[in-house]
Amino acid sequence: MATMSNDAAAAATWHNNTSTPMDTTEPATNSHNPGETAVIGGPEALLLPSGSGPEEMNRHPLLMAQAHGEHHQPRLLHNFPVIPPPIQQHQQPPLLQQAQPSQIPHPTQPQIDPTMFTQQSGFNWPPIDPNTIAALAQAQLASSHAQFVSLALTLDPTLLSHFLATQQIPPVPQPLVHKKAEMELRVGNRFRLGRKIGSGSFGDIYLGQNIQTNEEVAVKLECVKSKHPQLHIESRLYRIMLGGIGIPEIRWCGQEGDYNVMVMELLGPSLEDLFNFCQRKFSLKTVLLLADQMLSRVEFIHCRDYIHRDIKPDNFLMGLGKRGNLVYIIDFGLAKRYRDSKHQHIAYRENKNLTGTARYASINTHRGIEQSRRDDIESLGYVFMYFNRGTLPWQGLKAVTKRQKYELISEKKISTRVDDLCAGYPEAFAQYLNYCRSLGFEEQPDYGYLRNLFRTLFHRQQFCYDYVFDWNTYKFYNESLEARNNFQQAVPNQRRH
């Protein structure tokens, strides 16, 4: 047998430095198929450019770290397929990526030692002739390394068998020949997890699908290691509110791995989203249509002995399909019971931290007073004026800390007279806020009186209860306006004689 050169010895040394398998089981999204989830595997030492010799390989940061006994978590690189972990017996293999024809090495090209891949992958290959290994060691200096890696990364059994056949290596064991297996994340055994669509008070919300009925759902996840887990409390409140108009239904709740999971009815965009869509300005008709439904949702929560404590446009969503005109209320992560089963009201307390969203919080909440029904109602009033005005006077205040910003908002809110806040808008809005601020801590709001303020205004304006909101007509208005402008540019006005 011929003696190996120094470069060949260096290449063999490189094999020894990279032969230790890495722990690679971190999930990631496959860039070639965004809807699929794959498992990253294999060392970054394989991701070397074409023409890399021993010197370039030894300069690779991961190889240098491995030489010193360090291990790094691999990362998915753009446009690189992924290497599945070793396939155990009776284990369904992960999704494989098809190799391109250009990735098949030519039989006459020198190839890298397949034992490197054997060591990295954990596959049990049949014994290889030592003479063949020695001969292949010389080929490690060739520029065909990237070609081998390009093929090996795909791990397509048919193509890999073709490659090994060019080296007179026994074919791939039959258990590795298989069809593609779809990879996906599921919760509750029947809900497929998709992309992230939002965030709540204590968790992220993802789009999901019931694989049995094809119904799309919303999936809320919360880490079980959260300092103050709230999702199980929120799911219980949804069940307490079950049956109310504008209350989303729960499909499933439980724990999956390190996450608490709640699967619920999928809803449409939030009022904040629609407000932005309409250039941050709602017409009076839309505000009154929304106010009527939003008041009813809050009243229903109160009649079930709870207060919401986080009233804001983001927590009111429109329905989908036939319920597209129905306003829903969501996110009970901060909700609190204000009276017990005997209708005993909670005690009045002070020096409470602010709970909720400062922009819409009541004045008493800013003052540290325990919240009750009056505070939810007052917060609604600020939301209505936000829709009318586009902004509130206490928005955009700058401060170094969050506490300082809350203090600035509180000072500005207290110093702003209701008449000034509602100047230029129908008197019903000022009457609404003045009534809310006059309520006692345990006093029950007169929801009917408040609704009639806006219904009377609605009829006085001769609006129609057709449930046509601004966002229903905004798109068509823009399209017609654009068409008219294009027509005027194409057909200029001509002087008449």
From Swiss-Prot:
Its EC number is 2.7.11.1. GO terms for biological process: endocytosis; positive regulation of canonical Wnt signaling pathway; positive regulation of proteasomal ubiquitin-dependent protein catabolic process; regulation of collateral sprouting; regulation of locomotion; rhythmic process; signal transduction. One of its GO terms (molecular function) is protein serine/threonine kinase activity. It is found in: Cytoplasm; Nucleus; Chromosome, Centromere; Cell junction, Adherens junction. Residues 14-34 have a biased composition (Polar residues). The keyword rRNA-binding does not apply. The active site is at D310. Exhibits substrate-dependent heparin activation. Disruption phenotype: RNAi-mediated knockdown results in precocious seam cell fusion and the early exit of seam cell from the cell cycle during the L4 larval stage. RNAi-mediated knockdown does not impair alae formation. RNAi-mediated knockdown results in a squat body statue, referred to as a dumpy phenotype, and rescues the incomplete alae formation defect in the lin-42 (n1089) mutant. RNAi-mediated knockdown increases the survival rate and partially restores alae formation of let-7 n2853 mutants at 20 dgrees Celsius. InterPro entries: CK1_Ser-Thr_kinase, Kinase-like_dom_sf, Prot_kinase_dom, Protein_kinase_ATP_BS, Ser/Thr_kinase_AS. Residues 88-105 have a biased composition (Low complexity). ATP binds at I197, G198, S199, G200, S201, F202, G203, D204, I205, K220. Residues 1-58, 86-109 are annotated as: Disordered. CDD domains: STKc_CK1_delta_epsilon. Keywords: ATP-binding, Biological rhythms, Cell junction, Centromere, Chromosome, Cytoplasm, Developmental protein, Kinase, Nucleotide-binding, Nucleus, Phosphoprotein, Serine/threonine-protein kinase, Transferase. PANTHER family: CASEIN KINASE-RELATED. Monomer. Belongs to the protein kinase superfamily. CK1 Ser/Thr protein kinase family. Casein kinase I subfamily. Essential serine/threonine-protein kinase that regulates diverse cellular growth and survival processes including Wnt signaling, DNA repair and circadian rhythms. Casein kinases are operationally defined by their preferential utilization of acidic proteins. Positively regulates the expression of components of the heterochronic pathway, which regulate developmental timing, such as the transcriptional repressor lin-42 and microRNAs such as let-7. Negatively regulates cell cycle exit and cell fusion to prevent the premature differentiation of hypodermal seam cells into adult cells. This is Casein kinase I isoform delta. It comes from Caenorhabditis elegans. The lineage of its organism: Eukaryota, Metazoa, Ecdysozoa, Nematoda, Chromadorea. The gene is kin-20.
